[in-house]
A protein has these predicted regions:
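Vicinal oxygen chelate
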Residues: 2-12, 30, 40-44, 62-139, ...
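Generic beta-structure capping elements
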Residues: 45-47, 55-57, 124
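A short local loop/turn or secondary-structure capping micro-motif enriched for an aromatic residue
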Residues: 59-63, 127-130
Length: 139
């Protein structure tokens, strides 16, 4: 397993993009319409993979109460099925996995920690890079 990225809810996407660009991040791509809101993916120069996901949901979004701060962080898992069995054995409930692309290889789910923080679990399809990269957002 490895940490993939941290998601942050932001009140003003343009302002936040300006800030993170000034810090040194580069915009890798955007996913404008998701249940979470508009997503902007950022990475540092020299890194191959996304490290920060800015989440902008002006009306609060379907998944969040409209405040700013941590949205979630994501962990890559080798096997979603094995991970879910392991979590269940430890008394940790997970949402039913979904597949963003409709395949059986690319699966995601969420668990909630004791303080209410969301952790996204991601199983990449075979051959996918070890993180989100520019290839995930063709221009």
């Amino acid at each position: 397993m490895r940490t993939l990225h941290v998601g942050l809810h932001v009140a003003d996407l343009d302002r936040s993009l300006d800030f993170y660009r000034a810090v040194g991040y580069e915009v890798v791509g955007h996913v404008p319409e998701t249940p979470l809101g508009h997503l902007a993916m950022l990475k540092l120069p020299g890194d191959d993979f996304v490290a920060v996901e800015l989440v902008h949901a002006p009306g609060g979004g379907a998944q969040h109460g409209g405040s700013t701060g941590l949205s979630h962080f994501a962990i890559q898992v080798e096997s979603m099925d094995a991970t879910l069995v392991n979590l269940a054995a430890r008394g940790i409930d997970a949402e039913a996995p979904t597949s963003p692309d409709g395949s059986t290889d690319f699966r995601t789910t969420r668990v909630i920690d004791p303080d209410g923080n969301t952790i996204e679990l991601v199983q990449w399809p075979a051959g996918h890079a070890e993180g989100l990269s520019a290839a995930d957002w063709p221009t």
